[in-house]
Swiss-Prot record:
It is found in: Cytoplasm. Belongs to the UvrB family. The keyword Membrane does not apply. Keywords: ATP-binding, Cytoplasm, DNA damage, DNA excision, DNA repair, Excision nuclease, Helicase, Hydrolase, Nucleotide-binding, SOS response. Residues 652-687 form the UVR domain. It comes from Synechococcus sp. (strain JA-3-3Ab). Residues 454-617 form the Helicase C-terminal domain. GO terms for biological process: nucleotide-excision repair; SOS response. This is UvrABC system protein B. GO terms for cellular component: cytoplasm; excinuclease repair complex. Residues 25-176 form the Helicase ATP-binding domain. The beta-hairpin motif is involved in DNA binding.
Length: 695
């Protein structure tokens, strides 16, 4: 019997029961891959939750980014309040990787800011995987990066049991050995203190205090304590304290690793000297010998992860352990959400990491073994996966092929294209929405006079909005310039309109979408509006300009995703402006019409009247916006020549904006710009710190 307890006031409806039954049957029959092809707004998460509950295995849910991972985690926690639903994403608030730019001879040291709360959640996830089966871990793709070996992590943990005879001094030494720090004045995560016969520990995986009471060398009681009030929350008969860090290296293994690092260093120095690269040899020897001395003296050094191959005893090229290895082999389930985005990310992680590190190795900043501190290659990751469910409204061909789907081939413009044949393989379709809302009608109109035609459609929605439920409009263009010109044209005609483009920061993007939902404006114009956060039930019209211009933004899957933006509204309509009907357009329209007919037939058979979706605005987004920026990008550029004149009250917000720009630069591999922004942030923080110290 499954240990998962799903709690909901709703029952599966529409074709959710059929989808749940299909997925569960396929998984229990032992099939490795299956796909849930669910249209927008059909309740895919609810279906997956029921599937997890019926299969009853520990589950890893992978999302393409932190935002969607957080959203999924919250939804699953509501559905499984009595089970362990954990959150595992990168614990860096900011991460500037170590890099070298040969063209300018610029070395940029690693710089990062670790979020302590997220680190706690990561430890909580691995602890749950060791101690229970009813676990769902929601993770971003960063979970395929190296993590400490689960065997060493578990072996290093310390068990405590009431009545156990144990030497206090040995316990304190063991705690220090697994990276806990003694601090008798202030308890915090990863610390412990001793007062007489009482040992208090704040573990890495939660914020409650573990109090162990001794009578001599015998454990008399184990209690969990509220860290603020000191109130006893519960008493336990036994528990296990896990290491404060995921990377744990026993002393004997550390000494062997040091010998191996020294041997590799000598080999690489000989290689550089033979090539006449004396500068690189000197640089490598100086840096590595310093790191070796730190490892001998304190067991740690900056950039220790670059020696992870030696510290974990792996062979050259062998994949590192990651979160997947904390699941028991062949006894867990993988769910890949938005698989059309997530699967390509898994493929791309290794190559980007390798290119940067290879430059460091070639120029003597790192030993070649640093290349093995890396994310998994795609083939390595999939080799670890026993069973998987792909989830998407537009799954990629690779996912469909793995799920046994059949394809038909079509030759277009000299290219041979493959297209999925509906109803084949282990592809479970879910097209009926619980609300009864059907896919939108799709109209194709000529480009001549398209702007005037669009204006008329917008006026129609504005008029209807004044008479009943609000309606909004999304317009997608091919270029940023076209989006700007169209926005200006609509503004001149009294339309409340904004546009989105790639240069808008994440915070400002959220702010614009929030204003859109609240009715601060009625029309949103943009180029790539396929990203998350645009599933707005108020959108009743999606207009696609230049729909016949083939390319990524007008490919079949992109068009279906855009059509889906109007699929949550009872009056949903899509207008494609085009002079020719491309293959992508024809297939997207045909697929939408196919789903629409299924939905209409279901509504007729069950006498269902479509109901509009009423969504509450997210308080989390609003509170996020409350600390949003006041200064625009031009102000930021001008801020530093007159930094001393910036009011102290505005510095925290300015730092926040610079951190966003710094993260964006690091993500785009613009290391020099990121380093400059980092230095600017340091100056501002020093000014704030100086002010606080003087007061």
């Amino acid at each position: 019997m499954s240990e998962f307890q799903l709690v909901s006031s709703y029952q599966p409806t529409g074709d959710q029961p059929k989808a749940i039954a299909g997925l569960v049957k396929s998984i229990l029959e032992g099939h490795r891959f299956q796909t849930l092809l669910g249209a927008t707004g059909t309740g895919k998460t609810f279906t997956i939750a029921h599937t997890i509950q019926q299969v009853g295995r520990p589950t890893l849910v992978m999302a393409p980014n932190k935002t969607l991972a957080a959203q999924l985690c919250n939804e699953l926690r509501e559905l499984f309040p009595y089970n362990a639903v954990e959150y595992f994403i990168s614990y860096y608030d900011y991460y500037q990787p170590e890099a070298y730019v040969p063209s300018t001879d610029t070395y940029i040291a690693k710089s990062s800011s670790i979020n302590d709360e997220i680190d706690m959640l990561r430890h909580s996830a691995t602890r749950s995987l060791f101690e229970r089966r009813d676990v769902i871990v929601v993770a971003s793709v960063s979970c395929i990066y190296g993590l400490g070996m689960p065997e060493e992590y578990l072996k290093a943990s310390i068990p405590f049991q009431v009545g156990q005879e144990i030497n206090q001094r040995e316990v304190l030494r063991d705690l220090a050995g697994i990276q806990y720090e003694r601090n008798d004045l202030e308890l915090a995560r990863g610390r412990f203190r001793v007062k007489g016969d009482v040992l208090e520990i704040v573990p890495a995986y939660e914020d409650r205090v573990i109090r162990i009471e001794f009578f001599g060398d015998e454990i008399e009681a184990i209690r969990l304590i509220d860290p603020v009030t000191g109130e006893i929350l519960t008493s336990l008969s036994a528990l296990r304290v896990y290491p404060a860090r995921h990377f744990v290296t026993p002393e004997a293994q550390l000494q062997q690793a040091i010998l191996n690092i020294e041997q590799e260093l000598e080999e690489q120095l000989a290689f550089f000297r033979k090539q006449g690269k004396l500068l690189e040899a000197q640089r490598l020897e100086q840096r590595t010998r310093y790191d070796l001395e730190m490892l001998r003296e304190v067991g740690y050094c900056n950039g220790i992860e670059n020696y992870s191959r030696h510290l974990t005893g792996r062979k050259e090229g062998e994949p590192p352990a990651c979160l997947v290895d904390y699941f028991k082999a062949n006894d867990w389930l993988l769910v890949v959400d938005e698989s059309h985005v997530t699967v390509p990310q898994i493929r791309g992680m290794y190559n980007g990491d390798r290119a940067r590190k290879q430059v460091l190795v070639d120029h003597g900043f790192r030993l070649p073994s640093a290349l093995d501190n890396r994310p998994l290659k795609a083939e390595e990751f999939w080799a670890k996966v026993h069973q998987c469910v792909f989830v998407s409204a537009t799954p990629g061909n690779w996912e469909l092929e793995q799920s046994g789907a059949q394809f038909e081939t079509v030759v277009e413009n000299g290219k041979t294209l493959k297209f999925y044949v509906p109803g084949t393989g282990r592809v479970i379709e879910q097209v009926i929405r619980p609300t009864g809302v059907v896919d939108p009608e799709v109209h194709v109109r000529p480009t001549a006079g398209q702007v005037e035609d669009l204006l008329g459609e917008i006026y129609l929605r504005l008029e209807r909005s004044q008479q009943g439920l609000p309606e909004r409009v999304i317009v997608t263009t091919l270029t940023k310039r076209m989006a700007e010109d169209l926005t200006e044209y609509l503004q001149e005609r009294g339309i409340r309109v904004r546009y989105l483009h790639s240069e808008i920061s994440s915070i400002e993007r959220i702010e614009i979408l929030q204003d859109f939902r609240e009715g601060a404006f009625d029309v949103l114009v943009g180029v790539n509006l396929l990203r998350e956060g645009l599933d707005l039930p108020e959108v009743s019209l999606v207009a696609i300009l230049d729909a016949d211009k083939e390319g990524f933004l007008r490919a079949e899957r992109s068009l279906i995703q855009m059509i889906g933006r109007a699929a949550r509204n009872v009056r949903g309509t899509v207008v494609m402006y085009a002079d020719t009907l491309t293959g992508s357009m024809a297939r997207a329209i045909a697929e939408t019409q196919r789903r629409r007919e299924i939905q209409l037939q279901y509504n007729r058979q069950h006498n269902i009247t479509p109901k509009p979706i009423i969504k509450k605005n997210s308080n989390a987004i609003l509170s996020f916006l409350a600390i949003s920026r006041k200064l625009n990008s031009q102000d930021l550029e001008k801020a530093f020549p007159v930094a001393d004149e910036i009011p102290l009250s505005e510095i925290p917000e300015l730092i926040g904006q610079l951190e966003l720009k710094m993260k964006a630069a690091a993500k785009n591999l613009e290391f020099e710009e990121a380093a400059q922004l980092r230095d600017q942030i340091k100056k501002l923080r020093q000014r704030l710190l100086g002010h606080h110290q003087s007061t």
